[in-house]
UniProtKB/Swiss-Prot annotation:
Residues 262-268, 286-290 are annotated as: RNA binding. This is Queuine tRNA-ribosyltransferase. Homodimer. Within each dimer, one monomer is responsible for RNA recognition and catalysis, while the other monomer binds to the replacement base PreQ1. The active site is at D89, D281. The keyword Glycosyltransferase applies. Coiled coil: none annotated. Catalyzes the base-exchange of a guanine (G) residue with the queuine precursor 7-aminomethyl-7-deazaguanine (PreQ1) at position 34 (anticodon wobble position) in tRNAs with GU(N) anticodons (tRNA-Asp, -Asn, -His and -Tyr). Catalysis occurs through a double-displacement mechanism. The nucleophile active site attacks the C1' of nucleotide 34 to detach the guanine base from the RNA, forming a covalent enzyme-RNA intermediate. The proton acceptor active site deprotonates the incoming PreQ1, allowing a nucleophilic attack on the C1' of the ribose to form the product. Pathway: tRNA modification; tRNA-queuosine biosynthesis. It catalyses: 7-aminomethyl-7-carbaguanine + guanosine(34) in tRNA = 7-aminomethyl-7-carbaguanosine(34) in tRNA + guanine.
Length: 372
């Protein structure tokens, strides 16, 4: 079945809202944080049963083991042993971000042009790119992207779009926006020929240009997409991103769920949720964990610091994650990182992912009380 979005409460203080997205594999309480399982797995975490929605990357699964192989094994849910909702992207994000730099990198002011090492050629038909695994030259069109996502079998899928960096010149920027909406329309048409249990979000582009964002919203809302995703360049810092998201959501109707693509660090979530964003995806908590940055209510903990060498307390006394309930001390976790024990990233990732889910629960409770 296509997803159903239920609005439970609209805050009286802002555009923040609490809702539920109903899919054939379960219900997602919103606002929700969506961890990224790049290759169909969360790095350092085996059990993802308590995570309501998981984001898998079509690009990486396209290169290995291949969507057809996954389809023969029953689709991603059976392949991964997951009986809860999954969202996949189009593959375009990785193609273009490997060439240009990602949206998150731009927000951190390091979105410098990388060159075209992976991206070979863009035409109106699609994108040619080189596999980072073996150098093969591959082609991805809107139809091929959707078919790959059909084979993977995710609950929510994304149409092919072109991700542009902040530094693009105006002429190419406008050309790209137009081409992206043609690609999205082709993607939607292909999807609707065989919708199965899947739903498709339309992606809104437009960079920092309010008029182009308005055009993007109008395009997505005029087409029968099941949800809206805010994509494209979001600026170079949190302030610019806030302006982009505020402008974009001001044009959106309230009937569909709204996802913010590629953004999911805590400062951004706190800043964006008031604009009515329903879900955020990011590899932030697991990536931070692998680098020894531990999330806690009192603020991030850089576990490698000397001051934790004799700290026998758990990461967060109020936390109910497996790491904290197992009595893993800060001193022990620091030791594991210092000796490069693989368990360090595992314990840290389990905690960080649980922390993100708890933060989202607290955000939903605050919205219900009209505190956000």
């Amino acid at each position: 079945m296509a997803l159903k979005f239920h609005l439970i409460h609209q805050s009286k203080k802002s555009q923040a809202r609490v809702g539920q997205i109903e899919t054939s594999h379960g219900v997602i309480d919103t606002p929700a944080f969506v961890p990224v399982a790049t290759h169909g797995a969360l790095k350092g975490v085996i059990d993802h049963s308590d995570i309501p929605l998981l984001f898998c990357n079509t690009y990486h699964l396209l290169l290995h083991p291949g969507p057809e192989a996954v389809a023969k094994l029953g689709g991603l849910h059976q392949f991964m042993g997951r009986q809860a909702p999954i969202i996949t992207d189009s593959g375009g994000f990785q193609i273009f971000s490997l060439a240009y730099g990602s949206v998150a990198e731009e927000i951190k002011s390091c979105g410098k042009k990388k060159g075209m090492s992976s991206l070979v050629k863009i035409t109106d038909e699609g994108a040619w790119f080189k596999s980072y695994r073996d150098g093969r030259k591959l082609f991805l069109s809107p139809e091929l992207s959707v078919q790959a996502q059909k084979d993977l079998g995710a609950d929510i899928i994304i149409p092919l779009d072109e991700l542009l960096p902040f530094h693009t010149d105006q002429e190419y920027f406008l050309t790209s926006c137009s081409r992206t909406y043609v690609w999205e329309k082709r993607s939607l048409e292909y999807h609707r020929k065989d919708p199965r249990h899947q739903s498709m979000y339309g992606v809104i582009h437009g960079g920092l240009d309010p008029e182009q964002r308005r055009i993007g919203v109008r395009f997505v809302e005029d087409e029968p997409f099941d949800g809206s995703a805010i994509g494209g360049s979001l600026g170079r810092n949190l302030q610019e991103m806030s302006e982009v998201v505020k402008i974009t959501t001001s044009f959106l109707s309230k009937e569909r769920p709204v996802h913010l693509l590629g953004i999911g660090d805590l400062p951004s979530i706190y800043a964006m949720v008031g604009f009515g964003i329903d879900s955020f995806d990011s590899s932030y908590p697991t990536k931070a964990a692998r680098h020894g940055l531990i999330l806690s209510k009192a603020g991030p903990i850089k576990i490698g610091q000397q001051k934790y060498s004799q700290d026998s307390s758990t990461i967060d006394p109020s936390c109910s994650c497996l790491t904290c309930l197992s009595g893993i001390s800060r001193a022990y976790l620091r030791h594991l990182f210092k000796v490069r024990e693989p368990n360090a990233a595992i314990w840290a990732s389990i905690h960080n992912l649980h922390h993100m889910q708890q933060v989202m629960k607290e955000i939903r409770e605050a919205i219900l009380k009209d505190e956000i």
